[in-house]
């Protein structure tokens, strides 16, 4: 059942369906990656909806959106995302390794995505990413900005 939940999650992501993605998480789920640390299906779902809406919002960014998954097991997956980073308009190719734990109903209880933040920041941010992407300072700035964006997104709903 857990492998099917992972497949359902990424199929919804490929369609940019953040609501369906949220339905894959338990109410008390936790999500963590290099940018976000979230608790609860509401927050996690809002993050996915915010990201999906950012891609869907403009035809030029929608045309660059590609998601590929592979090596899906009942506890992990590898996925690659091609997209335009909406803040800078720069193209990004990000390789992510995901690890999951599930509740008894097969819903995601913990989701941890790992990716090379410096590689991501060089693509997404350009020169600032090249120079500072390896530093905690830039990572914390990106986290803070992402958190503020998510807070604004939640306030609108």
Regions found by a protein language model. Give the residues of each.
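C-terminal and inter-domain tail/linker signature
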Residues: 1-157
């Amino acid at each position: 059942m857990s492998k099917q939940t992972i497949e359902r999650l990424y199929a919804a992501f490929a369609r940019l369906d953040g609501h369906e993605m949220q339905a894959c998480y338990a109410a008390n789920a936790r999500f963590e990656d290099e940018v976000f640390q979230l608790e609860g299906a509401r927050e996690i779902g809002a993050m996915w909806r915010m990201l999906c809406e950012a891609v869907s919002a403009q035809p030029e960014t929608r045309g660059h959106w590609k998601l590929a998954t592979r090596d899906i097991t009942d506890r992990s997956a590898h996925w690659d995302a091609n997209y335009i980073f909406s803040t800078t308009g720069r193209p990004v190719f990000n390789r992510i390794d995901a690890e999951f734990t599930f509740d008894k109903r097969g819903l995601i209880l913990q989701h941890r995505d790992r990716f090379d933040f410096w590689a991501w920041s060089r693509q997404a941010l350009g020169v600032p990413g090249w120079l500072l992407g390896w530093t905690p300072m830039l990572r914390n700035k990106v986290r803070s900005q992402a958190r503020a964006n998510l807070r604004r997104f939640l306030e609108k709903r």
